[in-house]
Amino acid sequence: MPETGVRNGAFGADKFGLKNLEAVYWNFGAPQLYEHALRKGEAMVNADGALCADTGVFTGRSPKDKFTVRDATTDQSVWWAGNQSITPEQFAALYADFLDHAEGMTLFAQDLYGGADPNFRIPTRVFTELAWHSLFIRTLLRRPDTSELAGFVPELTVIDLPSFRADPERHGVRSENVVAIDFVRKIILIGGSHYAGEMKKSIFTTLNYYLPDNGVLPMHCSANVGPEGDSTIFFGLSGTGKTTLSADPKRTLIGDDEHGWSKEGIFNFEGGCYAKCIKLSQEAEPEIYAASKRFGAVLENVVHDESTRVPDFDDGSKTENTRSAYPLEFIPNASLTGRAGQPKNLVMLAADAFGVLPPIARLTPAQAMYHFLSGYTAKVAGTERGLGNEPQPEFSTCFGSPFLPRDPSVYGNMLRELIARHNVDCWLVNTGWTGGKYGTGRRMPIKVTRALLGAALDGSLREVQFRTDRYFGFAVPTSVPGIEPHILDPIKTWADKAEFDKTACALVGMFQNNFTRFEGDVDAEVRAAAPEVRAAAE
């Protein structure tokens, strides 16, 4: 079995049962992987030099096809209300069939780290069938120095074979597409899908399982750090502005999606970014635009002009979930260490399409835990198929429900403790609607959001007066220099005050109904942080 590239010769593919392979290419960089991807017809190079691939049927993750091994260890440690199980025997059969399927293949292997902090990173080996998948995961995770590769011993192994087809009856899964994770053996098997994001999020799920035992809170968030070393964490679901608001030219970007919070500070899990690029423009997001238009970037499902190979980022005919993967070093003000000290501020972003949340509110640690466990935003027509004219609430616990292997209260309690220990200021920011709900109101002006966020991060919001919100109980500033006072109080932006009250009460009820599943896992202080309609202030 020919093996080419820098590697640990004593810990090769045979250690994982991979045998009779055509070849294994180890730790190849972008130029070599481009060559193989083009030679194999997996991808094409566009006019900017980016490697471009289509993912076929699967243009996003398939959460219903993700399974976790339920054994004596994970029976008690995994949150089974949010995760699907298979037996150890079913996983063993799946693993054996993966190994059989791989015989005769050429595989690409990457030795990488999940995590920028040497104290907590997890050495990860990824075998892929596709060369462009190898470049993708090399871009997204942390790359070791070449000198480390000869002695690299993985703790976590991923085998990614898009041409594999699972047998639902034999393997205990739903379809021919599968993502299976064995936390005890530390193996991830991915088959049936060409969507590269399955690798990224499966590894993230695994880090979310292991790291709490080491005192690290894993988070689905972006993060940046100011010139004084003051770092900020941004939580938020898709469409809330997490990537946009954390990309601040005055601050250094730590990462755009996955981080850990330890006693030493915060650190990026990744070494690259995986940005949505539908309607990407130089004017709106110049750094992401530039990073996506150069050699080394990997574009998924982006439509191109057939003759010129120029990308059309406005064309969503293949999918609205077009993606660009690129190394962090493609962003001019990104941190190459991926690490920062203890956060000074924590921001939870919500695109409230009901138009009743204030543009900014200060949270107590208990309120922060409540809103973290709630993970609220709202969907509107145009963001997802099948939505009508009315906004639809979305609650994704810990702002990352699909990636949580442990009970959400594990992460919520860790967050609350870290906030209290490090005296972190917590903020809820509404990037959604004002002056009415979606359809009658308008989107919160980005200039207002940036100004309020700037005032929170530089400490000037500490100097203003606050009121207690009648519906949600958090503290809302009554005046902020440079901001018109009425926009700080949502009811004052609505023409119909009675309709505002009706809508606000309805949203309070949605929060309360969603949180019933967590009430047995939190203490009285967190339960008391729940929204309720309070008497109006005099």
Curated annotation (Swiss-Prot):
One of its GO terms (molecular function) is metal ion binding. ATP binds at K201, H220, G236, L237, S238, G239, T240, G241, K242, T243, T244, E285, R323, T449. Pathway: Carbohydrate biosynthesis; gluconeogenesis. Binds 1 Mn(2+) ion per subunit. The keyword Manganese applies. InterPro entries: PEP_carboxykinase_ATP (IPR001272), PEP_carboxykinase_C (IPR013035), PEP_carboxykinase_N (IPR008210), PEPCK_ATP_CS (IPR015994). Gene3D superfamilies: 3.90.228.20, Phosphoenolpyruvate Carboxykinase, domain 1, Phosphoenolpyruvate Carboxykinase, domain 2. The keyword Nucleus does not apply. It is found in: Cytoplasm. Its main location: cytoplasm. Keywords: ATP-binding, Cytoplasm, Decarboxylase, Gluconeogenesis, Lyase, Manganese, Metal-binding, Nucleotide-binding. GO terms for biological process: gluconeogenesis. Its cofactor is Mn(2+). Substrate binds at R61, Y195, K201, R323. HAMAP family: PEPCK_ATP. Involved in the gluconeogenesis. Catalyzes the conversion of oxaloacetate (OAA) to phosphoenolpyruvate (PEP) through direct phosphoryl transfer between the nucleoside triphosphate and OAA. Belongs to the phosphoenolpyruvate carboxykinase (ATP) family. This is Phosphoenolpyruvate carboxykinase (ATP). It comes from Nitrobacter hamburgensis (strain DSM 10229 / NCIMB 13809 / X14). The gene is pckA.
